[in-house]
Amino acid sequence: MTKERTFIAIKPDGVQRGYVSEILGRFEKKGFKLVGLKQLIPSKELAQNHYGVHRERPFFGDLVDFISSGPVVAMVWEGEGVILSARKLIGATKPLEAEPGTIRGDLAIDIGRNIIHGSDGEDTAKFEINLWFNEEELCEWETSDSKWRSEN
């Protein structure tokens, strides 16, 4: 496997409930490298672009309003298989269907307040990273323990 990048966002409910450090810790403990991090209150335009795939769905307006209602912690994580692994760490979209031990399984109850967003594939990850971050906001660096994280 080659190193890849994914976009992760802690939604306003996760920030307000104080889960930022716990979520960061789960990704770090898994062995992924944080290469982009910022906190912002997204504009309606950014939220609409991010969730554009849902534009025709009945919940789109409420979703945009929610995401732009408070601070979001936007992140880019890097590592081997990070997209699929992040999806497993996050858990099912519906928290009541998410396995215990996942972020949503442990911390969320309602689908409308499910704490976190993660890219669902390579193309989506590239789109979302480019939407939320400028290239100069991403940090290229090597961890001092990289040889202990993977054979590659």
Swiss-Prot record:
It is found in: Cytoplasm. Homotetramer. GO terms for molecular function: ATP binding; metal ion binding; nucleoside diphosphate kinase activity. GO terms for biological process: CTP biosynthetic process; GTP biosynthetic process; UTP biosynthetic process. NCBIfam families: PRK00668.1. Major role in the synthesis of nucleoside triphosphates other than ATP. The ATP gamma phosphate is transferred to the NDP beta phosphate via a ping-pong mechanism, using a phosphorylated active-site intermediate. This is Nucleoside diphosphate kinase. The active site is at residue 117. InterPro entries: NDK-like_dom (IPR034907), NDK-like_dom_sf (IPR036850), Nucleoside_diP_kinase (IPR001564), Nucleoside_diP_kinase_AS (IPR023005). HAMAP family: NDP_kinase. It comes from Prochlorococcus marinus (strain AS9601). Its EC number is 2.7.4.6. Pfam families: NDK (PF00334). The lineage of its organism: Bacteria, Bacillati, Cyanobacteriota, Cyanophyceae, Synechococcales. Belongs to the NDK family. It catalyses: a 2'-deoxyribonucleoside 5'-diphosphate + ATP = a 2'-deoxyribonucleoside 5'-triphosphate + ADP; a ribonucleoside 5'-diphosphate + ATP = a ribonucleoside 5'-triphosphate + ADP. SUPFAM superfamilies: Nucleoside diphosphate kinase, NDK. One of its GO terms (cellular component) is cytoplasm. It comes from the Bacteria. Its cofactor is Mg(2+). Keywords: ATP-binding, Cytoplasm, Kinase, Magnesium, Metal-binding, Nucleotide metabolism, Nucleotide-binding, Phosphoprotein, Transferase. ATP binds at residues 11, 59, 87, 93, 104, 114. Its main location: cytoplasm.
